[in-house]
Amino acid sequence: HHAFWIHPNNPNFIIDGNDGGIGITRDKGKTWIFDEKLPVGQFYHINTDNETPYHVMGGMQDNGTWRGPAYTWMSGGIKNYYWENIWGGDGFDAMPDPDDASWIYAMSQGGSVGKYNIKTGESWYMKPPQLDEKTMLRFNWNAAMAQDPHSNSTIYYGSQFLHKSTNKGA
């Protein structure tokens, strides 16, 4: 929550400004209405695919990972409903599979990484295997993830170690 406004003559009426937009209560916080018409969000990272039209994707603070078209040939421009949520949590990195843009790698807080298919809805989590029973992997809140520019099957992922997958994280 970044901002609160309390009506000076009616303390039951409060507006809450937060990472996802605004919440409005008229009963001192017992019930809230969230305005979903405001296109509000804070992206941590963004990426694009190579489709036509190309898509922008990225992780948003407290609002998961989203993907939408960069432009449209339809009158009225890009609509909010063109965007789709592909991963939950605090969204961070998102990157398309360079061989099949319907698959997107997505990461959320604490090193949670997975792959999501925008056509089928199929998803699965990816985690590097434990090195041994005594070594616990520690991930930064916003852990690193990258596609190898020379090998479409190789992705890198960071904890206190650099992890490398040569089979797209399978």
Language model segments and positions:
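Beta-propeller blade termini and top-face loops
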Residues: 1-170
